């Protein structure tokens, strides 16, 4: 492997902000935020909106996320 061309592969904490679930794994993601993990060490923090803890496929719960009223517009347009 060529030196100095590969990203740094390190332990990173991912935080699912939807379900408030955190997990520690290894990644090349870079971030300026850090968090204190359960082992007392500080790790880089990457915030994600959806992970296996909040995705409907994995949780078995179906919920609609309507960010701009698109569902209401659709229902109004095609209402009988």
Swiss-Prot record:
Family: Belongs to the bacterial ribosomal protein bL31 family. Type B subfamily.
Gene Ontology MF terms: structural constituent of ribosome
Lineage summary: Bacteria, Pseudomonadati, Pseudomonadota, Gammaproteobacteria, Lysobacterales
A Pfam family per the record: Ribosomal_L31
Keywords per UniProt: Ribonucleoprotein, Ribosomal protein
PROSITE patterns: RIBOSOMAL_L31
Gene Ontology terms: cellular component: ribonucleoprotein complex; ribosome
UniProt-listed InterPro entries: Ribosomal_bL28/bL31-like_sf (IPR034704), Ribosomal_bL31 (IPR002150), Ribosomal_bL31_B (IPR027493), Ribosomal_bL31_sf (IPR042105)
Keyword Ribonucleoprotein: yes
Protein name: Large ribosomal subunit protein bL31B
